[in-house]
Amino acid sequence: MSGEKTDCQKFFEANAENNQRCKALQDFPSEVQIAWESQSASEVSPGVVTDNEQLCRHWTNPIHYDDATGTLKLTAFDDAAGIGLSVNRMAHTTLAAVGQFASARVLGWNAEHGYMPQRSLVGYSLFDAKEARQVLTNDAPARRAFGVYDTAKVPNETTGQEGDTSHADVCQLIAGPQAARSLRHRMRDLLAPRLTPFSNGDSPEASSA
């Protein structure tokens, strides 16, 4: 990506340290939210996220997964209304790379927080970008509930953030706690049945379990 920054990129760069960036996005009109999906949000972007792109979301226990029910927690989707629900674009990465990255994060967190309940990698869910974009509100007139943005990550030596051109965010576009809960249910209904364990070749943690 080169040239003048888009409004979308300006917004996401200005809110890079804002853990409520999706809430900030909710302040914009629907037409702006949707238009920004057609603009690059990062200087290292490989291009905007198209409807037919396959996306991958990984899940950890106990943050996202409920052992008692054997399924994803509703709160696993809270990030969509806050910092953004991080996903990887499978056109720009591999399942093995996602599994190894996710496993490294889990192992790193456990090493730094040995005094807390330890986390484990549960698996992943695959879905097309258009499936998130096709979720509509129940009220009339129905409107788009989620946007998918190509928030490719730039390496940052100061924070230790690794570069990741496959990174994208699913953001909830509708404000309000009641709407948020209903929409989280819709996303869980979409992704929970697709929860798949990483194979040994996709995750170092799986191979050592």
Q: Positions of the model-derived regions?
A:
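Conserved NAD+-utilizing ADP-ribose enzyme module
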Residues: 2-53, 74-85, 91-209
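Fungal intrinsically disordered, Ser/Thr/Pro-rich regulatory tracts
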Residues: 57-63
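Short aromatic-glycine-(Arg/Gly/Cys) micro-motifs in beta-strand/loop hairpins
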Residues: 63-77
